[in-house]
């Protein structure tokens, strides 16, 4: 009977370790989700700023006169 008791105790220890690991992984997932949400918000702010920018007075490369050829 001692062998069965040892097996049960070993399984209980493994289960406890797995529960701890799952909780640690869950906390990491929560942190990463918060980080992603923050980065998405920052990207949206940058997109808004880029859209609000006035066009540049500098001519585009297509509008520039070509350089003289030698």
UniProtKB/Swiss-Prot annotation:
Pfam families: SlyX (PF04102). InterPro entries: SlyX (IPR007236). It comes from the Bacteria. Belongs to the SlyX family. This is Protein SlyX homolog.
């Amino acid at each position: 009977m001692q062998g069965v008791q040892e097996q049960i105790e070993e399984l209980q220890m493994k289960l406890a370790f797995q529960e701890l690991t799952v909780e640690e992984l869950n906390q990491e997932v929560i942190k990463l989700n918060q980080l992603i949400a923050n980065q998405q918000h920052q990207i949206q702010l940058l997109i808004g700023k880029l859209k609000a920018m006035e066009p540049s007075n500098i001519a585009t490369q297509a509008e520039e006169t070509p350089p003289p050829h030698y």
